Amino acid sequence: MGLSLVCTFSFQTNYHTLLNPHNKNPKNSLLSYQHPKTPIIKSSYDNFPSKYCLTKNFHLLGLNSHNRISSQSRSIRAGSDQIEGSPHHESDNSIATKILNFGHTCWKLQRPYVVKGMISIACGLFGRELFNNRHLFSWGLMWKAFFALVPILSFNFFAAIMNQIYDVDIDRINKPDLPLVSGEMSIETAWILSIIVALTGLIVTIKLKSAPLFVFIYIFGIFAGFAYSVPPIRWKQYPFTNFLITISSHVGLAFTSYSATTSALGLPFVWRPAFSFIIAFMTVMGMTIAFAKDISDIEGDAKYGVSTVATKLGARNMTFVVSGVLLLNYLVSISIGIIWPQVFKSNIMILSHAILAFCLIFQTRELALANYASAPSRQFFEFIWLLYYAEYFVYVFI
């Protein structure tokens, strides 16, 4: 029986990588073709008879595989010609990929669920006032409102970077997918980015001709974001200051956004019933977020001596506290809709909060079934942020 020895060539150019850069297993590439029934004969460089074949493996193939090999060789040559003929496209794609990857890393770094929360506050408060005063709408106003988001997002981004820089060891246990832990971004780059972000927010705040009060609030917010994570102050290591800062950030941001909204629209700052309701509701919700954010971090916090309410109560008890307080918040909201129909739109108040309460009960049950593991606990925390966004959406129409 006629046999042919076919070896896999290994040139300086690694063709199987060029043809498929994501192929982690070269044995599956075109250059490692093996007939399903063909045995592989191991050989060393010393024993191999040809000086041109550099691999240690060669395949003993029957003549009936000749057509497959020829077809394979043509495919390799065609792929090689295509690769060699498009160096500029590779360069362009490489630059574009790096930019996209850096943007994605920054997005992960600034905690997407918090960014969405900041945007929901601004859009909810601004949207309600504009909804009730449609005659004030203008594209110039919308453009100004868009730029007003920059200081808010800058403050959040700065605080997130500081927190992750000084929590790298803890996050290796609690959140190994974060950019600084996984190595997607270096600590040096994170520091440079934090300075750029803080200065950008300050410049935009001044350029918007904001009142001195708002400039002071922004500067204080940057200081609070720094003091929250950076030793020796590190407010987050003390349960009371950790709790107080978290609540203050939510309530203070709502107050600041409402004040900026009324100022931009030329409206007086009035404590209307709806605004009083959302401030009270978000004060309670800020408490639940302050508690819930530590449930998934219990293991890492306990290992590094960070004392939180969650580490003292445990994941199960902490989850019931969070869910219980939030359910009470929803029941009070439903009661307000029933008692004061002349002030609030009762149908929206009752129905929306009943639906959100049901969703909360369902998610609490799902976490219990998952035995309060770290990953499901983190998903539960992000679900509470979904409830946060939803409340500001409901606020527009109550």
Curated annotation (Swiss-Prot):
Return the Pfam families for the record: UbiA (PF01040)
Main localization is: plastid
Q: Which gene encodes it?
A: GOT
Chloroplast as UniProt keyword: yes
Could you tell me the membrane topology recorded for this protein? Multi-pass membrane protein
Q: Which organism is it from?
A: Cannabis sativa (Hemp)
* Protein keywords: Chloroplast, Membrane, Plastid, Transferase, Transit peptide, Transmembrane, Transmembrane helix
What is this protein's tissue specificity according to the annotation?
Expressed in young expanding leaves.
An example Gene Ontology biological process = cannabinoid biosynthetic process
Transit peptide range per the UniProt entry: 1-77
**Function of the molecule:** Aromatic prenyltransferase involved in the biosynthesis of cannabinoids-related terpenophenolic natural products, which have pharmacological activity. Catalyzes the transfer of geranyl diphosphate (GDP, GPP) to olivetolate to produce cannabigerolate (CBGA).
Pathway terms, separated by semicolons: Secondary metabolite biosynthesis; terpenoid biosynthesis
List its EC numbers: 2.5.1.102
Query: In which family does this protein belong, per the annotation?
Result: Belongs to the UbiA prenyltransferase family.
Q: What class of enzyme is it?
A: transferase
The subcellular localization recorded is: Plastid, Chloroplast membrane
Q: Per the UniProt entry, how does temperature affect activity?
A: Optimum temperature is 30 degrees Celsius.
| Membrane-spanning ranges | 141-161, 186-206, 213-233, 251-271, 273-293, 320-340, 342-362, 378-398
What pH behaviour does activity show? Optimum pH is 7.
Q: Does the keyword Transmembrane helix apply?
A: yes
Q: What is this protein called?
A: Geranylpyrophosphate:olivetolate geranyltransferase, chloroplastic
